[in-house]
């Protein structure tokens, strides 16, 4: 968090001492811009230099951690951490080091620098930033910027065709397009469930059906245009996005062949951003006919694929956006791989034949046999018999040995950072026993006994993010906000600086006295 912590602190020190913060080349000043939204968040521009913020860069590269603090990320990736990891004790110890042991303070600071550098080195983050910048035209230290990146790739191609793009103030909103298609699930515990997954579904739809801003303008004038949705029609000849995606697709395949994972990831993120860009009012090409012709086509493809599979006497128990979950059952043990591979091949062939007939296009849809769950659980919605959505768990075999397996959880407590460690661990062990046909009743009773005997207090800690300033929580004051306010009151009495006034993460427990911050638990 170099911008909003390190550099902001240095700026405040300079202000206090009436110094100019000259960090740029040629003694140029650092330039600050306050974020339009966010708790005291700033952007920093340093002339002639690039500032790479590790947190923002890792989020851009789709890393996911419960906590993006240097201590947590370094423990996860490097298996080592800061020399002092307790927030409050760290402040006291740093002050003591400054006053009594400056070499020790230097060691502490140097280790922080080593941790950051080693994370960047291990994960190739600088290479990712360079590849992303080369691909999108964005500055190395600009994060997000999908619309600007789209303009960088699309506008020159549009201009070479002799067209000028509309200005943002010329846009009109024409309703809302739906999101991805999510099927109603059939709850239960199953044997042998396979997942068939469309490879990059939305980019494939754009290529197949010529979804494109220029193609839309031209297609509305043509009699033989490819039909879209909500009045959209797309030219068979004049389209830029399909060609652009084809080039990116080829480049990604080449990057994979060259084992260039960094470039492959950058290209994937770029291709997958096109749908979102076309659906935002911040894009000069925004038109619901474009977006709905992608999402509604996705709905149509998912429903038709489900029907194709069920006509072959296999049950589809769930589907979500680009994935279909197919039940094979215990009788197919030993044939799962063969069935999954054949189903995917048959479905790809069927789509090629169908789309060649109507609307007369080449199909770039590609479904793959992705995962085999030897055991699979689709839960019900709490308090209902209806199947849930975006929540499931399964056991995947990774080898032939007894212990060669892994558990996969989606949307359940075990993968939610705002649930306690006990809840997550309990769910993992319980599901593991159920999937492996092991007894679980005594385990449940044992956990309940130990819980009532207060053996799990450290595992009952909850962790949640404060997304606004504490003072901004007025009408609705959830438990984690109450805990943060208690923590700030205790810190104020002890003469400690504020920790949560501007947001952040809070760890707390639910007690008979209400929510209490973990670090000040009585």
Residue ranges and their predicted role:
Residues 219-232, 237:
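Conserved phosphoryl-transfer catalytic core
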Residues 1-7:
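Proline-aspartate-enriched helix->loop->beta-strand connector
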